[in-house]
């Protein structure tokens, strides 16, 4: 991949058919126009006040530079010269250049001396998705189009063509590697003293699933769908075996794969339905439904008060640096029970648990607070208390049946220091959630918890990349200034 070689461009035709970065300067023709005959006192199209009617017009006809799109243009340029030195795409590429992607290179089957076309460099695909995530691009088709039209994406590609199938497959094909990258990137910041895990804020955000409300069906309907899907697969298989035409066989094979995938999704939906029914009471089991599109999605109450198919994305963020330190995705509609797994995730990733964790009332379950605050874990919980049922009772005074960890939590939350510390929760967790939404984390375009979590990891790594740049900037300036 070369970004610095000179390219000679000789163009004849319409300039508006070229990419944005294809032309740097265009000569136009000078024409004269007749003054407008409309009333000069009328407001102009863009609300610019008209000339003073008493002011005499300048002598001669006005001269304007008019657009000329049929002019032949020659340009000598390189991709590297088209991208500013301080562009964010360069930051992303520099980060990817320092990653250990040996696991991806070991999976490349195209080798020197062997048959087949060359594989796309994994660094290009990694950089494309990181930069696209920062720019709010979540569609593989849209990203593939940008790789042909937009100078920043073209610079990352460096002349390598990338199709949307390759981009789509790469995005969800390596969840273990992305998980490892998150751990290593945060560990590097911890080694530099930029992240301490002294205080971590956790929050969940409900993100729309790639499924419609009409895809949720009850058991009887799912069983009927399963039967119809199996029959369709058998019919297409028989049709494929009987038709000798190559092109027709190719189309029929695609139809058979689609039918087989639908049959598998319906089967998964039946399995998920059994789990849903096991959590419901007897009278509510008949109302249990599962999606045939994304069986692992659940109908959740969204921020606007509506109910839609969604996944619950959990981010844990270091309050001092706003670096995402933990990622989890569940299909539970509430945040109950999500604090202990996240604390354990930090122990598994970094060999230490957060000293303090800040959560909202949805996480404040007594058994979870006790588990996290136990001497074996040693994490201090800051979470709001529920309003007491008995009027006039001080909520910060321990109840007679409280164990030591719960009593300490109640007393702690009544202190001015705890109330001041808890203010950091919204400033950290809510801020990271808002940034993720601004970058496009509003609806998933993939299905299944594993793929959804993989996409969430892309957001976390991209976010941490920019936070690392900001955190290291003062040290870099000190070195330059010193």
Feature-to-residue mapping (PLM):
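A general alpha-helix detector
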Residues: 78, 124-130, 166, 184
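N- or domain-start disorder-to-order transition segments that initiate the globular core
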Residues: 65-74, 82-86
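Secondary-structure junction/capping motif
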Residues: 78, 86-87, 91, 121, ...
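Short, charged, low-complexity loops and linkers
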Residues: 79-83, 419-420
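Anion-binding and metal-coordination hotspots
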Residues: 2, 8-49, 54-60, 65-66, ...
